[in-house]
Amino acid sequence: LIRRPLLSFLAPSRIFDQTFGEHLQESELLPASPGFSSFLMRSPIFRMPSWV
């Protein structure tokens, strides 16, 4: 059995394979839908922390 992350529908599975400290392309973090991605970027939960 292959276990998939709960939020795999929101983000590519590659994100969950990253080791801490690796950089991701911004395009990989954003979903395909432009309307949904603009909602995510406005949401304070999904903003990048200042220490990144």
From Swiss-Prot:
Keyword Translocase: no
Residue stretches in coiled coil: none
Pfam families per record: Crystallin (PF00525)
An example molecular function term from Gene Ontology annotations: protein homodimerization activity
InterPro entries for this protein: Alpha-crystallin_N
Superkingdom field: Eukaryota
Keyword Transmembrane set for record: no
Keywords attached to this entry: Eye lens protein
Quaternary data: Homodimer. Aggregates with homologous proteins, including alpha-A-crystallin and the small heat shock protein HSPB1, to form large heteromeric complexes.
Family, per entry: Belongs to the small heat shock protein (HSP20) family.
Task of the protein: May contribute to the transparency and refractive index of the lens.
Name the record gives this protein: Alpha-crystallin B chain
Naturally occurring in which organism (per UniProt): Eudromia elegans (Elegant crested-tinamou)
Gene name of the record: CRYAB
